[in-house]
């Protein structure tokens, strides 16, 4: 008898959750076992009615009561303990880790400790605690499969998806669209509005990640992820601006060969690849018509995109705590920008100041990660007044 793969989707109401559920709708291979949401209870209720999960998780009791008033045939759990439970249940096979921000850290670790197949879209798990998460994955024989289009592309380009071929890799090259302001100089961005920063030319994404794309913070975080996912030194990671977002990333091998993964910019492709791995599943994605594209590439200038400069410097110095500071400061500053409390250029300007002024030892456990994160946010709040 055919057995469906049971999946927990952390962050089911976000853009990655949407694409994951779109894949599930098109196939008959997956059973949604648990769904979680932070604020959009109405949408979560609709998803519960459609997919009939056994569990749903919301952040607090008031949202639990609201969800229970909308749906009756699902067990509603609350808070961090609920997230960790649905990430580690014996019945589930796959955990889609798509919560935005450091809130995704503990449930991702819970899935790793339970030996689950983790589809990783939550950047912060690797950005803030990469050394700790990789240790947990290895120790518990879990699987960590990247969902970001760039890292999933690299995952597909590396022979056997393991580390036996690492000596053969000369360079991992991440591509970046460059965002909506890729052709503008910094002095032209003084009066950028949140609406302009969120208007990504190629991808449909949430507001925070759209701003991160425009500042190239998103790509800087992806450099950190690649560092941990593929066990390569910082000098073996490169970034190219590729406005068409068709070549999702590539690997250069020591014999001069380049292997790239291409496709239309649709998150269903990397998500389906991760969900079905080690096989491939059929999903409804537009075919790539090569006759319609002229693919162009250019170097990502570190002076123009200073987020890259900050992160590469942190990795070269093995200053992993500084990456926690960088990430926490960015989250606070982007929120301030979206609420029109600071100017667009201050996102990076203030982050440079904070990253330079705060110094911590590399964390030895997840509690220390959260402590560095908390202190950074408090410091940013004091700077912003």
Curated annotation (Swiss-Prot):
Positions of Mn(2+) binding: 148, 150, 222
Binding annotation for 1-deoxy-D-xylulose 5-phosphate: 123, 149-150, 177, 200, 213, 218-219, 222
Binding-site list for NADPH: 13-16, 40, 122, 124, 206
Pathway in which this enzyme or protein is active: Isoprenoid biosynthesis; isopentenyl diphosphate biosynthesis via DXP pathway; isopentenyl diphosphate from 1-deoxy-D-xylulose 5-phosphate: step 1/6
Catalysed reactions listed for this entry: 2-C-methyl-D-erythritol 4-phosphate + NADP(+) = 1-deoxy-D-xylulose 5-phosphate + NADPH + H(+)
Biological process terms in GO annotation: isopentenyl diphosphate biosynthetic process, methylerythritol 4-phosphate pathway involved in terpenoid biosynthetic process
The enzyme's E.C. designation: 1.1.1.267
Cofactors demanded by this protein: Mg(2+); Mn(2+)
Top-level taxon: Bacteria
Signal peptide range in chain numbering: none
Example of a GO MF term: NADPH binding
Pfam families xref list: DXP_redisom_C (PF08436), DXP_reductoisom (PF02670), DXPR_C (PF13288)
Class of this enzyme: oxidoreductase
Annotated keywords: Isoprene biosynthesis, Manganese, Metal-binding, NADP, Oxidoreductase
Record family assignment: Belongs to the DXR family.
Function: Catalyzes the NADPH-dependent rearrangement and reduction of 1-deoxy-D-xylulose-5-phosphate (DXP) to 2-C-methyl-D-erythritol 4-phosphate (MEP).
HAMAP family to which the protein is assigned, alphabetical: DXP_reductoisom (MF_00183)
Protein name: 1-deoxy-D-xylulose 5-phosphate reductoisomerase
Species annotation: Francisella tularensis subsp. tularensis (strain SCHU S4 / Schu 4)
Gene: dxr
């Amino acid at each position: 008898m055919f057995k469906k793969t049971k999946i927990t989707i952390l962050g089911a109401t976000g853009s990655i959750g949407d694409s994951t559920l779109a894949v599930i709708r098109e196939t008959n291979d997956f059973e949604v076992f648990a769904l979680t949401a932070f604020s959009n209870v109405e949408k979560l209720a609709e998803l519960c009615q459609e997919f009939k999960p056994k569990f749903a998780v919301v952040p607090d009791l008031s949202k639990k009561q609201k969800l229970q008033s909308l749906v009756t045939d699902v067990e509603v759990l609350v808070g961090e303990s609920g997230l960790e439970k649905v990430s580690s249940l014996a019945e589930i096979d796959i955990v889609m880790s798509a919560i935005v921000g450091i809130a995704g850290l503990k449930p991702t670790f819970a899935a790793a400790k339970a030996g689950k197949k983790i589809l990783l879209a939550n950047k912060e798990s690797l950005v803030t605690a990469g050394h700790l998460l990789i240790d947990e994955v290895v120790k518990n024989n879990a699987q960590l499969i990247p969902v970001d289009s760039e890292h999933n592309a690299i995952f597909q380009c590396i022979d056997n998806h393991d580390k036996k071929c690492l000596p053969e890799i000369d360079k991992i090259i991440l591509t970046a669209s460059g965002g909506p302001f890729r052709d503008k100089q910094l002095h032209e961005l003084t009066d950028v509005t949140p609406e302009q920063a969120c208007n990504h030319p190629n991808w449909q994404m949430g507001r925070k990640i759209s701003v991160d794309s425009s500042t190239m913070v998103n790509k800087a975080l992806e450099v950190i992820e690649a560092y941990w996912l593929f066990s390569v030194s910082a000098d073996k990671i490169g970034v190219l601006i590729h406005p068409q977002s068709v070549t999702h990333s590539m690997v250069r091998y020591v014999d001069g060969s380049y292997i790239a993964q291409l496709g239309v910019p649709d998150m269903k492709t990397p998500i389906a690849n991760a969900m079905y791995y080690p096989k491939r599943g059929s999903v409804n994605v537009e075919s790539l018509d090569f006759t319609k594209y002229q693919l162009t590439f250019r170097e990502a200038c570190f002076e123009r995109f200073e987020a890259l400069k900050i992160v590469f410097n942190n990795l070269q110095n093995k200053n992993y705590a500084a990456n926690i500071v960088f990430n926490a400061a960015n989250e606070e500053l982007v929120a301030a920008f979206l609420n029109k409390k600071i100017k667009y250029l201050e996102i990076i300007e203030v982050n440079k100041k904070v990253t330079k002024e705060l110094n911590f030892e590399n964390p030895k456990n997840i509690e220390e990660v959260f402590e560095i994160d908390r202190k950074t946010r408090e410091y940013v709040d004091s700077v912003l007044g």
